[in-house]
Protein backbone atom coordinates (compact mmCIF):
# COMPACT_ATOMS: atom_id res chain seq x y z
CA UNK A 1 0.00 0.00 0.00
CA UNK A 2 1.73 3.15 -1.19
CA UNK A 3 1.80 6.49 0.58
CA UNK A 4 -1.15 8.48 -0.70
CA UNK A 5 -1.94 10.22 2.57
CA UNK A 6 0.48 13.17 2.11
CA UNK A 7 0.68 13.07 5.92
CA UNK A 8 4.48 12.97 6.15
CA UNK A 9 4.77 15.82 3.68
CA UNK A 10 2.28 18.33 5.06
CA UNK A 11 2.15 17.88 8.83
CA UNK A 12 3.61 20.89 10.60
CA UNK A 13 5.55 20.00 13.73
CA UNK A 14 6.42 22.48 16.43
CA UNK A 15 9.79 22.49 18.10
CA UNK A 16 10.13 20.20 21.09
CA UNK A 17 11.13 22.93 23.55
CA UNK A 18 9.48 23.37 26.92
CA UNK A 19 7.29 26.27 25.80
CA UNK A 20 5.98 24.32 22.80
CA UNK A 21 5.29 21.24 24.92
CA UNK A 22 3.43 23.34 27.46
CA UNK A 23 1.27 24.82 24.71
CA UNK A 24 0.50 21.36 23.31
CA UNK A 25 -0.45 20.04 26.76
CA UNK A 26 -2.70 23.05 27.34
CA UNK A 27 -4.55 22.32 24.11
CA UNK A 28 -4.85 18.60 24.90
CA UNK A 29 -6.18 19.44 28.38
CA UNK A 30 -9.02 21.37 26.75
CA UNK A 31 -9.70 18.60 24.25
CA UNK A 32 -9.95 15.95 26.98
CA UNK A 33 -12.14 18.22 29.10
CA UNK A 34 -14.56 18.91 26.25
CA UNK A 35 -14.77 15.21 25.35
CA UNK A 36 -15.38 14.26 28.99
CA UNK A 37 -18.15 16.83 29.43
CA UNK A 38 -19.94 15.55 26.31
CA UNK A 39 -22.76 12.99 26.20
CA UNK A 40 -20.37 10.06 26.67
CA UNK A 41 -19.38 11.09 30.19
CA UNK A 42 -16.05 10.85 32.00
CA UNK A 43 -15.46 7.10 31.65
CA UNK A 44 -13.17 6.44 28.64
CA UNK A 45 -14.46 2.87 28.29
CA UNK A 46 -17.93 4.15 27.38
CA UNK A 47 -16.94 7.41 25.67
CA UNK A 48 -15.16 6.92 22.30
CA UNK A 49 -14.43 10.65 21.92
CA UNK A 50 -12.76 10.76 25.33
CA UNK A 51 -10.86 7.55 24.64
CA UNK A 52 -9.52 9.07 21.43
CA UNK A 53 -8.57 12.35 23.12
CA UNK A 54 -6.62 10.48 25.80
CA UNK A 55 -4.85 8.33 23.18
CA UNK A 56 -3.94 11.47 21.27
CA UNK A 57 -2.61 13.11 24.44
CA UNK A 58 -0.51 10.07 25.31
CA UNK A 59 0.93 10.04 21.78
CA UNK A 60 2.06 13.62 22.43
CA UNK A 61 3.71 12.51 25.73
CA UNK A 62 1.26 14.38 27.94
CA UNK A 63 1.89 13.37 31.58
CA UNK A 64 -0.70 11.15 33.24
CA UNK A 65 -1.21 13.75 35.99
CA UNK A 66 -2.26 16.34 33.40
CA UNK A 67 -4.76 13.91 31.88
CA UNK A 68 -6.21 13.16 35.31
CA UNK A 69 -6.56 16.89 36.07
CA UNK A 70 -8.58 17.36 32.89
CA UNK A 71 -10.85 14.47 33.90
CA UNK A 72 -11.20 15.86 37.43
CA UNK A 73 -12.24 19.22 36.01
CA UNK A 74 -14.85 17.51 33.86
CA UNK A 75 -16.18 15.68 36.91
CA UNK A 76 -16.67 19.00 38.68
CA UNK A 77 -13.73 18.58 41.04
CA UNK A 78 -11.96 21.73 39.89
CA UNK A 79 -12.80 25.38 40.62
CA UNK A 80 -12.49 26.69 37.05
CA UNK A 81 -15.90 26.34 35.45
CA UNK A 82 -15.08 27.59 31.94
CA UNK A 83 -17.18 26.08 29.15
CA UNK A 84 -15.49 25.52 25.78
CA UNK A 85 -17.18 25.44 22.39
CA UNK A 86 -15.66 23.92 19.24
CA UNK A 87 -15.63 26.30 16.28
CA UNK A 88 -14.25 25.35 12.85
CA UNK A 89 -12.98 28.07 10.51
CA UNK A 90 -11.75 27.84 6.93
CA UNK A 91 -10.12 30.20 4.46
CA UNK A 92 -8.21 30.10 1.18
CA UNK A 93 -5.26 32.44 0.59
CA UNK A 94 -3.42 33.39 -2.59
CA UNK A 95 -1.72 30.48 -4.32
CA UNK A 96 -4.61 28.11 -3.64
CA UNK A 97 -3.59 27.27 -0.06
CA UNK A 98 -6.64 26.29 1.97
CA UNK A 99 -6.70 26.28 5.76
CA UNK A 100 -8.93 24.51 8.24
CA UNK A 101 -8.61 25.85 11.79
CA UNK A 102 -10.14 23.92 14.70
CA UNK A 103 -10.67 25.93 17.88
CA UNK A 104 -12.00 25.38 21.39
CA UNK A 105 -13.11 28.67 22.85
CA UNK A 106 -14.73 30.06 25.99
CA UNK A 107 -15.42 33.31 24.11
CA UNK A 108 -16.65 32.82 20.54
CA UNK A 109 -16.56 36.53 19.64
CA UNK A 110 -12.94 36.87 20.73
CA UNK A 111 -11.88 33.77 18.84
CA UNK A 112 -13.66 34.74 15.62
CA UNK A 113 -12.15 38.22 15.77
CA UNK A 114 -8.65 36.84 16.26
CA UNK A 115 -8.88 34.25 13.48
CA UNK A 116 -10.31 36.81 11.05
CA UNK A 117 -7.48 39.18 11.96
CA UNK A 118 -4.86 36.56 11.10
CA UNK A 119 -6.39 35.90 7.69
CA UNK A 120 -6.97 39.60 6.99
CA UNK A 121 -3.18 39.92 6.93
CA UNK A 122 -3.19 37.28 4.18
CA UNK A 123 -5.88 39.22 2.27
CA UNK A 124 -8.28 36.33 2.82
CA UNK A 125 -11.84 36.17 4.14
CA UNK A 126 -13.18 33.40 6.32
CA UNK A 127 -15.53 30.89 4.74
CA UNK A 128 -18.76 29.74 6.35
CA UNK A 129 -18.12 28.72 9.95
CA UNK A 130 -18.32 24.97 10.50
CA UNK A 131 -17.85 24.09 6.83
CA UNK A 132 -15.17 21.59 5.81
CA UNK A 133 -13.58 22.60 2.48
CA UNK A 134 -13.72 19.98 -0.29
CA UNK A 135 -9.91 19.94 -0.32
CA UNK A 136 -9.91 17.87 2.91
CA UNK A 137 -10.95 14.32 3.81
CA UNK A 138 -11.81 13.32 7.39
CA UNK A 139 -9.57 10.36 8.26
CA UNK A 140 -8.06 8.37 11.10
CA UNK A 141 -4.26 8.42 11.42
CA UNK A 142 -1.96 6.21 13.48
CA UNK A 143 1.82 6.41 13.39
CA UNK A 144 3.93 3.60 14.87
CA UNK A 145 7.69 3.40 15.28
CA UNK A 146 9.39 0.82 13.07
CA UNK A 147 11.20 -0.43 16.16
CA UNK A 148 7.92 -1.81 17.54
CA UNK A 149 6.61 -3.91 14.64
CA UNK A 150 7.57 -5.41 11.29
CA UNK A 151 5.84 -4.22 8.14
CA UNK A 152 4.39 -7.59 7.12
CA UNK A 153 2.67 -8.24 10.46
CA UNK A 154 1.34 -4.70 10.61
CA UNK A 155 0.05 -4.84 7.04
CA UNK A 156 -1.85 -8.08 7.63
CA UNK A 157 -3.60 -6.77 10.75
CA UNK A 158 -4.40 -3.42 9.17
CA UNK A 159 -5.79 -4.91 5.95
CA UNK A 160 -8.05 -7.22 7.95
CA UNK A 161 -9.40 -4.32 9.99
CA UNK A 162 -10.28 -1.60 7.54
CA UNK A 163 -7.05 0.32 6.93
CA UNK A 164 -7.06 2.32 3.71
CA UNK A 165 -3.33 2.95 3.43
CA UNK A 166 0.00 2.16 5.08
CA UNK A 167 2.92 4.49 4.41
CA UNK A 168 6.49 3.63 5.43
CA UNK A 169 8.80 6.51 6.36
CA UNK A 170 12.41 6.27 7.51
CA UNK A 171 11.38 5.82 11.15
CA UNK A 172 7.73 4.84 11.21
CA UNK A 173 4.63 3.36 9.62
CA UNK A 174 1.66 5.67 9.06
CA UNK A 175 -1.76 4.00 8.86
CA UNK A 176 -4.75 5.80 7.36
CA UNK A 177 -8.33 4.66 8.01
CA UNK A 178 -11.84 5.94 7.55
CA UNK A 179 -13.31 7.62 10.63
CA UNK A 180 -15.71 4.68 10.98
CA UNK A 181 -12.95 2.03 10.98
CA UNK A 182 -10.44 3.92 13.11
CA UNK A 183 -11.35 2.44 16.51
CA UNK A 184 -11.59 -1.11 15.14
CA UNK A 185 -8.21 -0.89 13.43
CA UNK A 186 -6.56 0.71 16.48
CA UNK A 187 -7.94 -1.97 18.82
CA UNK A 188 -6.73 -4.73 16.49
CA UNK A 189 -3.23 -3.26 16.36
CA UNK A 190 -3.12 -2.97 20.14
CA UNK A 191 -4.40 -6.48 20.84
CA UNK A 192 -2.82 -8.47 17.99
CA UNK A 193 0.56 -6.74 17.87
CA UNK A 194 0.86 -5.68 21.52
CA UNK A 195 1.30 -2.03 20.53
CA UNK A 196 0.71 0.42 23.37
CA UNK A 197 2.63 3.46 22.11
CA UNK A 198 1.72 5.59 19.10
CA UNK A 199 3.67 8.50 17.66
CA UNK A 200 0.37 9.86 16.33
CA UNK A 201 -3.13 8.59 17.05
CA UNK A 202 -6.03 10.79 16.05
CA UNK A 203 -8.96 11.63 13.82
CA UNK A 204 -7.69 14.33 11.50
CA UNK A 205 -8.15 16.10 8.18
CA UNK A 206 -5.94 15.20 5.22
CA UNK A 207 -5.68 17.15 1.97
CA UNK A 208 -6.80 15.25 -1.12
CA UNK A 209 -4.75 17.59 -3.33
CA UNK A 210 -1.85 19.86 -2.43
CA UNK A 211 -0.18 23.07 -3.58
CA UNK A 212 3.56 23.65 -3.34
CA UNK A 213 5.24 26.70 -1.82
CA UNK A 214 8.97 27.36 -2.05
CA UNK A 215 11.57 29.88 -0.96
CA UNK A 216 10.63 33.10 0.79
CA UNK A 217 6.91 32.53 0.26
CA UNK A 218 7.15 29.15 1.98
CA UNK A 219 8.91 30.68 4.97
CA UNK A 220 6.30 33.42 5.32
CA UNK A 221 3.48 30.88 5.27
CA UNK A 222 5.26 28.69 7.82
CA UNK A 223 5.55 31.74 10.08
CA UNK A 224 1.84 32.40 9.54
CA UNK A 225 0.97 28.80 10.49
CA UNK A 226 3.11 29.08 13.63
CA UNK A 227 1.25 32.25 14.62
CA UNK A 228 -2.10 30.53 14.15
CA UNK A 229 -1.00 27.52 16.19
CA UNK A 230 0.27 29.75 18.98
CA UNK A 231 -3.20 31.19 19.61
CA UNK A 232 -4.54 29.77 22.87
CA UNK A 233 -7.94 29.03 21.32
CA UNK A 234 -6.54 27.12 18.33
CA UNK A 235 -6.37 23.35 18.72
CA UNK A 236 -5.33 22.27 15.22
CA UNK A 237 -4.32 23.90 11.95
CA UNK A 238 -4.72 21.87 8.77
CA UNK A 239 -3.64 22.98 5.31
CA UNK A 240 -3.02 21.59 1.83
CA UNK A 241 0.51 22.94 1.40
CA UNK A 242 3.70 21.03 0.67
CA UNK A 243 6.87 22.97 1.41
CA UNK A 244 9.98 22.54 -0.71
CA UNK A 245 13.35 23.89 0.34
UniProtKB/Swiss-Prot annotation:
User: In terms of domain of life, where is this protein from?
Assistant: Bacteria
Output the NCBIfam families linked to this UniProt entry: PRK00110.1, PRK12378.1, YebC/PmpR family DNA-binding transcriptional regulator
Instruction: Write down what this protein is called.
Output: Probable transcriptional regulatory protein MAG6590
InterPro entries, alphabetized? Integrase-like_N, TACO1_YebC-like_2nd/3rd_dom, TACO1_YebC_N, Transcrip_reg_TACO1-like, Transcrip_reg_TACO1-like_dom3, YebC-like
Q: Which Gene3D superfamilies match?
A: 1.10.10.200, 3.30.70.980
Does the keyword section mention Transcription? yes
Q: Name its cellular compartments.
A: Cytoplasm
Is Metal-binding among the key words of this record? no
- Can you name one GO molecular function term for this protein? DNA binding
List all membrane-crossing ranges.
none
Q: Which PANTHER family match?
A: TRANSCRIPTIONAL REGULATORY PROTEIN YEBC-RELATED (PTHR12532:SF6), TRANSLATIONAL ACTIVATOR OF CYTOCHROME C OXIDASE 1 (PTHR12532)
Q: Which keywords does this Swiss-Prot/TrEMBL entry list?
A: Cytoplasm, DNA-binding, Transcription, Transcription regulation
Q: Source taxonomy lineage?
A: Bacteria, Bacillati, Mycoplasmatota, Mycoplasmoidales, Metamycoplasmataceae
Q: Name one GO biological process term.
A: regulation of DNA-templated transcription
* Recorded family membership: Belongs to the TACO1 family.
- Name any GO cellular component annotation: cytosol
